[in-house]
């Protein structure tokens, strides 16, 4: 049974909800912290289905929270894995140019990395071959030595253990139902919460609207899937990524080194718009109301061609299937053949925030709140990498809101 009262109530048991709960407890040790997770265990959605890539932070312009927080987030999560004895592969990442048209984008990524202090090396084609003989590039490529790989499920499990040790009440199988005068309604009863922190991922906008926030924002879910290499298929020494289209938040189909020590890879992801928020496989978790709302919104985006949505949709149609993914990956790494990629990994869903007034995708982290509640609305990649640094930043923002109330009273 859920406790009837708590000082802080965190909704959502992904990596960000867990790090927020831990940071709240660290800064407000005399306060009680409760975390709600509607699933039977924490991290079963975006966090547990994450690619496991620990990003370095050079994709983002210096004026963004992503740029500000990713380098420190990378350092802290890598240190956490070492401290806890969790798997960590410091394999680095190559960003390769497919042709001459990609070279300006490569230079822009280097400029962004320099502006935020992220270590990067511009390599010649010969240097690339020495680092990863199978990588294909035009003239040069960018190498990120700080990019790494972790095991998301083990990170989440370790954070759950930390929460228990910190006397945080982690209530799994308990769903948020709504806001009421007597407190927060849950599937296990009403909780009188002094302050609500919303880290609900795919449902963050819905929770926020109960408190008068997210008026201009809605979650637009995107499905992502990877193909896994068959046992014995050739591996790679480092991640290999293309130069992305910097105007949208997706990094393109890439070749990712998996944990295990053998260099085994996966290729992907797809980035197809989902028709309901938890459209993982088949019709499981189907919600008619969500399907109708999201389908209508996506048809409108196609009609208006918001943020080049038609081009994104067409590109996704070309790469959505197995052959399309293999073809794209083969442009990055030699020796990628369809016969070696027959198995799909688990589907992940990106809780991408859409500004419905401006008809554009939000590129940076977004949050809103007041003296009663705080809502993390856009916590897409690299939020897993940033979990510790983002949680520290957000709890500071929460403290500012609570301090204003204390000063006024």
Put a short name on every predicted segment.
Residues 126-129, 218-223, 228-230, 303-379:
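Flavin (FAD/FMN) cofactor-binding core of flavoprotein oxidoreductases
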């Amino acid at each position: 049974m859920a406790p009837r009262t708590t000082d802080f109530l965190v909704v959502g048991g992904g990596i960000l909800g867990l790090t927020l709960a831990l940071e709240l407890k660290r800064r407000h040790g005399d306060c009680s912290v409760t975390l709600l997770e509607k699933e039977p265990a924490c991290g079963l959605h975006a966090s547990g289905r994450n690619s496991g890539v620990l990003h370095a932070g050079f994709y983002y312009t210096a004026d963004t929270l992503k740029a500000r927080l990713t380098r420190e987030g990378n350092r802290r999560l890598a240190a956490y894995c070492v401290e806890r004895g969790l798997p960590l592969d410091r394999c680095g990442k190559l960003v390769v140019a497919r042709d001459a048209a990609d070279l300006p984008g490569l230079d822009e990524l280097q400029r962004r990395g320099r502006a935020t202090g992220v270590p990067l090396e511009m390599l010649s084609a010969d240097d690339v071959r020495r680092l990863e003989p199978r990588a294909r590039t035009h003239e040069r490529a960018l190498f990120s030595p700080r990019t790494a790989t972790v095991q998301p499920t083990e990170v989440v499990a370790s954070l759950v253990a930390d929460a228990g040790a910190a006397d945080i009440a982690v209530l799994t199988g308990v769903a948020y139902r709504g806001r009421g005068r007597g407190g927060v309604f849950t599937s296990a009863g009403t909780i009188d919460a002094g302050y609500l922190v919303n880290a609900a991922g795919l449902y963050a906008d819905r929770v926020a609207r109960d408190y008068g926030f997210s008026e201009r924002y809605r979650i637009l879910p995107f499905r992502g899937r990877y193909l896994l290499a068959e046992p014995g298929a050739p591996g790679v020494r480092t991640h290999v990524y293309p130069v992305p289209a910097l105007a949208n938040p997706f990094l393109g189909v890439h070749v990712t080194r998996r944990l295990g020590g053998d260099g085994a890879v996966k290729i992907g992801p797809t980035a197809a718009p989902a028709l309901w928020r938890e459209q993982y496989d088949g019709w499981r978790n189907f919600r008619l109301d969500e399907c109708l709302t999201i389908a209508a919104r996506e048809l409108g985006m196609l009609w208006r061609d918001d943020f080049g949505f038609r081009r994104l949709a067409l590109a996704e149609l070309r790469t959505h299937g197995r052959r399309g993914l293999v073809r794209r990956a083969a442009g990055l790494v030699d020796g990628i053949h369809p016969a070696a990629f027959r198995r799909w990994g688990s589907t992940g869903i990106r809780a991408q925030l859409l500004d419905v007034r401006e008809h554009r995708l939000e590129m940076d982290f977004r949050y809103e709140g007041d003296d009663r509640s705080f809502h993390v609305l856009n916590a897409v990649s690299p939020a897993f990498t940033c979990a510790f640094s983002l949680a520290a930043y957000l709890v500071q923002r929460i403290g500012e809101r609570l301090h204003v109330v204390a000063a006024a009273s």
